Amino acid sequence: MLKRFLTVSLCLLLTLAAAAQTKKTATKKATAGPAPDKAYLQKIWDGWATLDPANTAKFYATGPHTFFDIAPLKYNSWDEYENGVKGVLAGYKSAKFTVNDDAAIHTEGNLVWATATVKDEMTNKSGKVEMGAFRWTVVFENEDGKWLIVHEHVSAPLG
């Protein structure tokens, strides 16, 4: 009798444990439009090459949780970022940016993150040409069918 009770109890316990398990289902929303690709990344930098942040605004989310990493320490919105970067870009008369072939793009539902190195060539107002390369990491979120930047980080090697 004890053996039968233990067997039934074990079966009941296993049944309850199995029923308590919730099946994980994908909660990703269907995304409208193709995810960003290298050409899309290049369009962003072509916008920056105009030296007018208004030409890149369409690529950026405007919400309060958007992150940009250029001096000062942080910006809390696209408006703050746009105003701050105007001062930096005012010292230049031309720019060209090229997203290199090492661009890597990863899609997960309504989020995309990408990394790339970007070649830059900028001419300041006095005519001095500055050339280099930097690292770019960017996170996009699909908002109403548009892939918008919600987090961006740019850095250059020391030295």
Where are the predicted features?
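Short, low-complexity N-terminal intrinsically disordered segments enriched in polar/charged residues
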Residues: 21-62
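A solvent-exposed, acidic/Ser-Thr-rich amphipathic alpha-helical stretch
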Residues: 35, 53-108, 131
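A short hydrophobic beta-strand element
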Residues: 109-120
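A short acidic/glycine-rich loop-to-helix N-cap element
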Residues: 125-131
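Beta-strand elements of well-folded, non-transmembrane domains
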Residues: 120-124, 140
